[in-house]
Amino acid sequence: MKNKKIKFIAKEVLQIEINALKSLKKFINQSFLKLIKIIINCKNGKIIVSGVGKSGIIARKWAATFSSTGTPSFYLDASNASHGDMGQITSNDVVILISNSGESQELKNIIQYSSRNKNIKLIGITS
């Protein structure tokens, strides 16, 4: 591949990313602010992030980023959650569930479990 073609493709990819970032502006609204405040105010708990499949990969990255920036956090494997791992979810935690469809049974199980405690905050992110 020639240098000119490589530069063209690189610029094209960057433009796609720029356009995608610009389109996110519309999502900075009241719901976004509420979500951010819930996360910021998680003082006596931890941030637990979960997802299934590709969403699980994203969830794992989010948990790692929260942890590396000083926010107590971990990734909860949704497929193992129903087999004893949900016990890691405790009062004052924030549970963030990432899903493409919002229909994953594994995540529904986490929602059902977490809903039993009013001090656990649930955040759902779907496409």
Predicted regions and their residues:
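An N-terminal, well-structured beta->alpha segment
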Residues: 2-45
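Glycine-rich phosphate-binding loops that contact phosphosugars or nucleotide phosphates
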Residues: 40, 45-127
